[in-house]
Curated annotation (Swiss-Prot):
Gene: rpoB
NCBIfam families, per the entry: PRK00405.1 (NF001616)
Location in the cell: Plastid, Chloroplast
Gene Ontology CC terms: chloroplast; DNA-directed RNA polymerase complex; mitochondrion
GO annotation, biological process: DNA-templated transcription
Name of the protein in its database record: DNA-directed RNA polymerase subunit beta
EC assignment: 2.7.7.6
Keywords (A to Z) from UniProt: Chloroplast, DNA-directed RNA polymerase, Nucleotidyltransferase, Plastid, Transcription, Transferase
Length: 1071
């Protein structure tokens, strides 16, 4: 973290810095580490040798720009070239060529990757750190059993356990365990070396009988015994080299390779001094672990907390990319070996160029970014979402946990998370606690641990020094939870007793015993939680919901920054990359909606702007210039605001006038009543861009054609097509309109020919071919304005590279009934009614309220922060002020938040000469009037300005109706889901509700006639259209017939009888 020039000052690190540092570590170190593992490859006769001169590898600058990669659906990558040599040992001749290994995707300026035109991001993963861990469990007799677990770098586990007779066993599988002596002997130690390297040799000798002596008499016997137990092999196996190789591959490589981090942890836990370069498990490690285990049984040593962050490591983007690069080099090695053997067998001429194929590296990275669970499509709903996505930490993924097997203890908050992992920001549902978010000041250290910054405390000095502590060092210091605001000018704490943290406990101790102190009030939280004002007054569950819902906010057409904020809005907007920033000082010489031209230092720089770009959530990303021609600017100044930013600050919602009161039941159960002003003045209007695409292929009957001449369709549907058969820019299209006209050739049957076609074929022998229309049609709910059309042609032009046509349609969506809105305190609701302005409640100065919330939603949810924000926002609106509030201000003064709000309301009341703004009898509340009658309400009502967001959950994307459509083949019931034009499910609770009203006939229709009765549903549809009595069928519905068939498959015959309503005769019907 860079230090500022002023004493005691600090700067917040870039929120995308973790991604950048990880990728740079992969380029600077990871590539060379994997390259050095690439061996020299020889043929079977050892006459030809192939090797890579990895010190001279080159990464070429990308051939395309980021925007072009997105536009053309390409991968933003760099080509990797390595000099390679082919040596003929007989003639001592060498041929050297620079060969192309493959493409490595590059990280862009947002900290993401562009793969096939899609923004993707790699999530950091939390894994159990390799090393050794001791724990204690109770057996069925209630006696403590001590075990140690050795975790390898590959994730494999081996256990040592001590029984009641103080015998030590190594458990190599769930069922099999072997003596520690056999394991040590199989690893290369004899009995004398074992006894010399342990602290309790008498315990090892206590269970050394004749049988054990025979097992460890030689290394070969020990290996055979170990293999027999490990592989569960019966009989008497014979020692051989293949047996050793199999044991080496299945056990020692997967369970004994500690890696760099594991070796460090093993040395620190067992007080060893084995060199860091020795990354494999040694007999000395096993014996030291056994000694420590014996000490545990005798009450010496401490057990390990597996959930402590010192026992976790972060698997960052550098580690994941390095693993994939190593996998690609292994595949390349196998391919080169096979090519050399094949070339020698067929006596072909060998060169380094024809030995190496670039497909190994390229396909490895393509499959990684496309299929790996930790490689995800970047969520770009708004600028905040982009940053937060890159700072996620996941326990899930390969080598990690699963949502169904993770225990509650793993999901819970741990004291070591303090200042490193946010205790609030996590996902909801089955993955709660398994997907977290980094705290804003946390960074990933060299050893894969999460480090947090603190200030050292000097009792008699003003000097401040910042240190980064890993979780393992954290326990040795007392850390004051106060920050720099709690210190006076002399640097000495005014209060003698301060709250502090020591060894995972929160205490109150004297200031003289403090070693470190926190640096920032938001140090413990993630970015999402740090944007919530008055977060200390909210329940943690509601703060969690708010952190998640801010990421779902839709960028509005006219953004507005919040009156009450936290101060991190500018940093979040800056690091998101949605704003255009001046890279150097200069003068603006030209500006329009497409670009800004800047002249500085003798050069002219053209800065392109983002114009109506679609995100993967269909939101609109757009940049608006904020500078005029002729204006002089400085480096770092905002040139253009992006989506959901104003003046370089994050602006996700709108400041609207709200009231907390019931209104005719329209805000029952979190429903929200809004004014029509929000619709007519486009307060909550947003733009959404949808993408529709179609491809042309070469079929067996010929190539498909893009044309505007479609004989099968009406001219009205083709009205928007140009002469090429593609919809024209700026056209307004409705559901069912043709966006791209396409004909697919096909050969018709003889019977389908028209008479004149058969005559032509008989007389002239002309083969008549017909074409089927396969046009791109606008689906339901897609109406809007065409803003862009892209015709992408792949290079090469073969039939395997089809042409792609993409049409982008923009929709303008006002707020409407059914949309979801939310505040920043977890207060969410659905729009229930849009009321005219004259009917809305109004203030004493005649201003109508914009939104009406239910007051019962506050006390039970315990998110009181919205009350503080509401009242302070009203004062800020009247005084034309903006507030940036730090959390936990009550630590400096009792009731600090309340005093601030009331003082600002009182000042606003004085300056505006409106006594109703602050009334001492009920401060914060006011008498308001019913817009329908003009009478005042009985009780004073809380009114104020709140920052309300419009979320991505909109009614236009969810509402759906069906009159008829497709049915499932087996059950003959309607399909499920909006995408399939499915029906509405009548579930168990819906049936109960209908039963409660006694509507037997409606219930029968919904469950039988309209659903899965094949003949009756056709009659019901026709009767509903023309009117009349709905017919009552006399046979069973299809679901009942399906049940009968399934019972018959179980050899059960079910006879059923239907009673006729006409004559009450029993008629037997076959199913």
């Amino acid at each position: 973290m860079p230090r500022d020039g002023n004493e005691g000052m600090f700067t917040i690190p870039g929120f995308s810095q973790i991604q950048f540092e990880g990728f740079c570590r992969f380029i600077d170190q990871g590539l060379m580490e994997e390259f050095h593992k690439f061996p020299k490859i020889e043929d079977t006769d050892q006459e030809i040798e192939f090797q890579l001169f990895v010190e001279r590898y080159q990464l070429v600058e990308p051939l395309i720009k980021e925007r072009d990669a997105v536009y053309e659906s390409l991968t933003y990558s760099s080509e990797l070239y390595v000099p390679a040599g082919l040596i003929w040992k007989t003639g001592r001749d060498m041929q050297e060529q620079t060969i192309f290994i493959g493409n490595i995707p590059l990280m862009n300026s947002l900290g993401t990757f562009i793969v096939n035109g899609i923004y993707r991001i790699v999530i950091n993963q939390i894994l159990q750190s390799p090393g050794i861990y001791y724990r204690s469990e109770l057996d069925h007799n209630g006696i403590s059993v001590y075990t140690s677990t050795i975790i390898s770098d590959w994730g494999g586990r081996s256990e040592l356990e001590i029984d009641r007779k103080s015998r030590i066993w190594a458990r190599v599988s769930r069922k099999q365990k072997i003596s520690i002596l056999v394991l040590s002997s199989a690893m290369g130690s004899n009995l004398r070396e074992i006894l010399d390297n342990v602290c309790y040799p008498e315990i090892f000798l206590s269970f050394l009988n004749d049988r054990e002596k025979k097992k460890i008499g030689s290394k070969e016997n020990a290996i055979l015994e170990f293999y027999q137990q490990f592989a569960c092999v019966g009989g008497d196996p014979v020692f051989s080299e293949s047996l050793c190789k199999e044991l080496q591959k299945k056990f020692f490589q997967q369970r004994c390779e500690l890696g760099r981090i594991g070796r460090r942890n093993m040395n620190r836990r067992l007080n060893l001094d084995i060199p860091q370069s020795n990354t494999f498990l040694l007999p000395r490690d096993v014996l030291a672990a056994a000694d420590h285990l014996i000490g545990m049984k005798f009450g010496m040593g401490t057990l390990d907390d597996m959930n402590h962050l010192k026992n976790k490591r972060i698997r960052s983007v550098a580690d994941l990319l390095q693993d994939q690069f190593g996998l690609a080099l292994v595949r390349l090695e196998n391919a080169v070996r096979g090519t050399i053997c094949g070339a020698i067998r067929h006596k072909l001429i060998l060169t380094p160029q024809n030995l190496v194929s670039s497909t190994s590296l390229t396909t490895t990275y393509e499959s990684f970014f496309g299929l790996h669970p930790l490689s995800q499509v970047l969520d770009r709903t708004n600028p905040l979402t982009q940053i937060v996505h890159g700072r996620k930490l996941s326990y899930l993924g390969p080598g990690g946990l699963t949502g169904r097997t993770a225990s509650f203890r793993i999901r819970d908050i741990h004291p070591s998370h303090y200042g490193r992992i946010c205790p609030i920001d996590t996902s909801e549902g089955i993955n709660v606690g398994l997907i977290g978010s980094l705290a804003i000041h946390a960074r990933i250290g060299h050893w894969g641990s999460i480090e947090s910054p603190f200030y050292e405390v000097y009792q008699r000095s003003k000097e401040t020094k910042m240190v980064f502590l890993s979780p393992s060092r954290d326990e040795y210091y007392t850390v004051a939870t106060g920050n720099s605001l709690a210190l006076n000018r002399g640097g000495i704490q005014e209060e003698q007793i301060v709250p502090a943290r020591y060894r995972q406990e929160f205490l109150t101790i004297a200031w003289e015993q403090i070693h470190l102190r926190s640096i920032f009030p938001f140090q413990y939280f993630s970015i999402g939680a740090s944007l919530i004002p008055f977060i200390e007054h909210n329940d943690a569950n509601r703060a969690l919901m708010s952190s998640n819902m801010q990421r779902q906010a839709v960028p509005l057409s006219r953004s507005e920054k919040c009156i009450v904020g936290t101060g991190l809005e500018r940093q979040a907007a800056l690091d998101s990359g949605v704003s255009a920033i001046a890279e150097c000082e200069g003068k603006i010489i030209y500006t329009d909606t497409h670009k800004i031209v800047l002249s500085g230092h003798g050069d002219t720089i053209s800065i392109p702007l983002v114009m109506y770009q679609r995100s993967n959530k269909n939101t609109c990303m757009h940049q608006n210039p904020q500078v005029r021609r002729g204006k002089c600017i400085k480096k770092g100044q905002i040139l253009a605001d992006g989506a959901a930013t104003v003046g370089g600050e994050l602006a996700l919602g709108k400041n609207v006038l709200v009231a907390y009161m019931p209104w005719e039941g329209y805000n029952f159960e979190d429903a929200v009543l809004i004014s029509e002003r929000l619709v007519y003045e486009d307060i909550y209007t947003s733009f959404h861009i949808r993408k529709y695409e179609i491809q042309t292929h070469v079929t067996s009957q010929g190539p498909e054609r893009i044309t505007h001449e479609i004989p099968h369709l009406e001219a009205h549907l083709l009205r928007n097509l140009d002469r090429n058969g593609i919809v024209a820019l700026g056209s307004w299209v409705e559901t069912g309109d043709i966006l791209v006209g396409k004909l697919t050739p096909q050969t018709a049957n003889e019977s389908s020919y028209a008479p004149e076609d058969r005559l032509l074929r008989a007389i002239l022998g002309i083969q008549v071919s017909t074409a089927k229309e396969t046009c791109l049609k606008l689906p339901i709910g897609g109406r809007g304005r065409v803003i862009d059309v892209r015709w992408i042609q792949k290079k090469g032009g073969s039939s395997y590279n089809p042409e792609t046509i993409r049409v982008y349609i923009s929709q303008k969506r006002e707020i409407k009934v059914g949309d979801k809105v939310a505040g920043r305190h977890g207060n969410k609701g659905i729009i229930s009614k849009i009321l005219s302005r004259q009917d809305m409640p109004y203030l004493q100065d005649g201003t109508p309220v914009d939104m009406v919330f239910n007051p019962l939603g506050v006390p039970s949810r315990m998110n009181v922060g919205q009350i503080f924000e509401c009242s302070l926002g009203l004062a800020g609106d009247l005084l034309d002020r903006h507030y940036r509030i730090a959390p936990f201000d009550e630590r400096y003064e009792q009731e600090a938040s309340r005093k601030l709000v009331f003082s600002e309301l009182y000042e606003a009341s004085k300056q505006t000469a409106n006594p109703w703004v602050f009334e001492p009898e009920y401060p914060g509340k006011s008498r308001i009037f019913d817009g329908r009658t003009g009478d005042p309400f009985e009780q004073p009502v809380l009114i104020g300005k709140s920052y309300i967001l419009k979320l991505i959950h909109q009614v236009d994307d969810k509402i759906h109706g069906r009159s008829s459509g497709h049915y499932a083949l087996v059950t003959q019931q309607p399909l499920r889901g909006r995408a399939k034009q499915g029906g509405q499910r009548v579930g168990e609770m819906e049936v109960w509700a209908l039963e409660g009203f006694g509507v037997a006939h409606i219930l029968q229709e919904m469950l039988t006639y309209k659903s899965d009765h094949i003949r009756a549903r056709q009659e019901v549809l026709g009767t509903t259209i023309i009117g009349g009595t709905i017919p009552t069928p006399e046979d069973a519905p299809e679901s009942f017939r399906l049940l009968v068939r399934e019972l018959r498959s179980l050899a059960l015959e079910l006879n059923h009888f239907l009673v006729s309503e006409k004559n009450f005769q029993i008629n037997r019907k076959e199913a």
